[in-house]
Amino acid sequence: MAYDLHGSWENKIGHHSQYRPHKDDPVGDIASTNYAVQYWTGKGLPANKLVFGMPAYGRCFSTNVDEPRVGDPATGASPAGTHTKEAGFLSYYEICDKIENKNWKVRYSSTMQAPFAYGEGQWCGSGFKTISY
C-alpha cells in the first residue's frame, strides 16, 4: 500500500503518499513508499511480487498557516468535498476543481517526490502532478 501514510487523524500536516520522507515528517522515515519497498525487499520478498497501489485522491487538512507545508500544525480535517462528502478526503477531480476554479496553489516537493496543493485554509497531498487531467 502506497497511500494513507498520513491523514486528518493527525494534528500535523503530512503527505499520505510521499515517495521519500520529508525532514519534518511527524513520524520520521517510515512514512514513505520507498521505505515500504526497501523494507519488504530487505526481508527477502522479491521485488516482482510487490504490488504498488497508487491513490487517485488526497488526504486533506485544515490549517491556519498561510503557506502550509509538511510538519505544520493542522486544525483538523478539511471540509467534506462536494462529491465525496467525507471530511479530510478529496477525490482527484475535486482537487483539480479547486486548483482550476478556487486558485489553489500547486507545489512539488523534490524532497518527498510528491505534489501537494493548498488554498482556502486547506492543504491536500495527492498525485495530481503525476496524473494529467
Go through each PLM region and give its residues.
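Glycan-binding loop/region signatures in secreted carbohydrate-active enzymes
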Residues: 8-20, 24, 54-133
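Non-cysteine beta-strand/loop elements that form the S-adenosyl-L-methionine
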Residues: 1-6
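A Trp-anchored, charged/polar loop motif used as the substrate-binding/catalytic surface
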Residues: 26-41, 132-133
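Loop/turn elements at helix/coil->beta-strand transitions in domains of secreted/extracellular proteins
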Residues: 45-51
